[in-house]
Amino acid sequence: MVVRGNTQSSTDTIWSYQILTKIQALQQTNTGFPPGIFPSTRVYAYNKNNSKNDPNVFFTGLIVHTLKKYHKLCTPYQQRIINQIVKDGLSSVGVFKNKSGRDTYNFWRTDTPQIFPNAGWLNKFDKSQSLPDDFDDSVILLWAQEVTKERAAVVHDTMQLYANTKVKSIKNSLPAFKNLPAYSTWFGKKMPIDFDMAVLCNVLSFVNAYDLQWTASDSASLQLITTAIDNKWHVTKADFIAPHYAKPAVIMYHIARLLTAGNQQNIQTLIALKPILLKQTDSLLANSKDPLENVLLSSARVHFGGIPIITSQTPDQAAIEQSKYPFFIANMASMLPSPVKRPLSKLAFAKFEYRCPAYNLALLWENRYLCVPLHK
């Protein structure tokens, strides 16, 4: 246990307040975005100078969820800031909801179908090529809104219809997963089955947080996660095993989040891997060069049983806020058959990297809380 004086505690509380007010300020400067939606940009990986505003709901859902997680432990004034951020952030999520009324969500707004907003000639295909709702945004937004268990259970039932082997089988994963009835990433019936290890972590986090009835597809999804860890594929084949996240540090963060979500009785096989995950995380930390990557790994290692890395050095807030390390990636090769997917997944011309300064700050705020409790 680290005993800190009142001066350090006050400094941490002020620091927390400053981060929250900066996050709120970023939310209020979102010209060109729906009200309350945090600004994010889409960067073409092949040409990093090609950056476009991307009005998605993904990062807003993550920020709301992250801040709400620690709300009860904040000072009353900080709670008021978080309350306003949450209220504003959730005010526009309805335009991203399934246009037929189903309780699922899309990455982009559904009232005016789009693919890659502000993409010039690509937007001629907005209606014909618009993406279906996805599991990732759906569970993130339902969780952020704290929907009832009854609503969560209905969506969970719907998910069972989109698992591998239900109607079609995956054609672009590792041989070990070919017949595994794990969840696809998409709700669309016309979409090929698409596995993403990080997305599956989010889905199971949602299932456990709501203590929903565990299904065969939940078990299969957990099996995919633990098999990948056993074989270290989340490190050596990150862009293949999690094509929409693609970075080992980001995958580690998602695994850690699953290990802290709700009822843990169904994930004992994953809990048993915490010592291995801690060792892998420390190895990645030793070679990390990006400040945001450091934040993700530092947060993950605490949940894997590591002793918090406590430092008196003030984090480089500006460097983390403007980090070019991508938390999320649009990988156009992710749905191609295996022989094509494997090489193309590594190439920059098939990817768009997403950045959100406000979410970077939320991750930093969370990390500081985990490593040095801010409000004690």
Question: What do the predicted segments below correspond to?
Answer:
Residues 4-376:
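Preference for long, amphipathic alpha-helical scaffolds in soluble/luminal domains
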